[in-house]
């Protein structure tokens, strides 16, 4: 539903450019994040998430205005969103009441020894909506059985990152002395001072860049099939996820679309 609202708003904003546009493109594709920042790495190290869990379909549209037979200006909007819930790997949670403490604590999972009261878990959501301006070069022009193109440009990326649920504070280590063996066991507080964690970066804006290439294949009068590869370079500064470097919002995008030529 959110994707539909964003795309409808984008179509409304860009509708005036149809007067000058030569091509309207509607497309669907797959987005593969590049995961090149420490918050991504932390999630994959600590949680039972896989990188493939964050590969997802995306939708978009674009308008092309041809400056010459071989060069066009492009305005485009795409949309990506993925939410995944998972469990911490190798840890169980004990309730504060069980321990006689003020906070829940995470213990290393050891069968028949530390089985826990529950399994600590949280959801991690990423949403990215790029609004991009590109220059597209068609070296062979706009006519032919195959119409290849390359290009690139700049964009404004609207994005959200959200974590909701349990957070184990591995930076705050305590020592639990096992009464049976006398062994010292490192343990960690869960959501200290709160029932759950709710960390959000809402409706943030960042500037990014992209490169693209593809091919258009005529299939009917005024209609071509488009296959496109796009790579986005973008990182967003985090404010509420304290201690983390800028978040990698970039990735690879493979899409298929239909072009209507005006």
Give the location of each predicted region:
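Cleavable N-terminal export/targeting peptides
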Residues: 1-23
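Short glycine/proline- and aromatic-enriched beta-strand/turn motifs that initiate or cap beta-hairpins
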Residues: 20-65, 259-261
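Repeated loop/turn-to-beta-strand initiation elements of outer-membrane beta-barrel proteins
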Residues: 24, 70-73, 143, 221-225
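Residues on the lipid-exposed face of transmembrane beta-strands in outer-membrane beta-barrel proteins
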Residues: 30, 61-65, 77, 131-139, ...
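Extracellular/periplasm-exposed beta-strand and loop segments of Gram-negative cell-envelope proteins
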Residues: 34-54, 81-129, 157-206, 234-251
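Predominantly the C-terminal beta-signal and adjacent terminal strand-loop region
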Residues: 48, 101, 211, 216-262
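Hydrophobic core residues within well-ordered beta-strands of beta-rich domains
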Residues: 57, 71, 129-131, 148, ...
């Amino acid at each position: 539903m959110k994707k539909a609202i964003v795309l409808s708003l984008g179509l409304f904003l860009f509708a005036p450019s149809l007067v000058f546009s030569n091509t309207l493109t509607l497309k669907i594709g797959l987005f593969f994040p590049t995961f090149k920042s420490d918050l991504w790495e932390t999630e994959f190290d600590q949680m039972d998430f896989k990188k493939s869990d964050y590969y997802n379909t995306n939708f978009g549209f674009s308008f092309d205005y041809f400056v010459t037979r071989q060069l066009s200006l492009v305005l485009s909007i795409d949309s990506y969103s993925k939410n995944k819930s998972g469990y911490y790997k190798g840890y169980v949670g004990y309730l504060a009441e069980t321990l006689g403490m003020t906070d829940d604590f995470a213990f290393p999972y050891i069968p028949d020894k530390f089985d826990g009261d529950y399994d600590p878990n949280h959801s991690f959501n990423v949403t990215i909506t790029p609004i991009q301006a590109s220059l597209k070069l068609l070296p062979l022009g706009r006519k032919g059985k195959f119409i290849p193109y390359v290009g690139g440009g700049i964009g404004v990326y609207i994005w959200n990152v959200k974590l909701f649920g349990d957070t184990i504070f591995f930076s705050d280590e305590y020592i639990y002395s096992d009464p049976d063996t006398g062994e010292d066991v490192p343990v960690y507080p869960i959501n200290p001072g709160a029932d759950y964690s709710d960390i959000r970066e809402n409706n943030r804006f960042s500037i990014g860049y992209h490169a693209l290439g593809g091919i258009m294949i005529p299939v009917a009068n005024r209609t071509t099939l488009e296959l496109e590869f796009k790579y986005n370079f973008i990182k967003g500064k985090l404010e509420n996820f304290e201690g983390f470097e800028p978040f990698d919002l970039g990735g690879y995008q493979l899409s298929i679309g239909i072009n209507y030529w005006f």
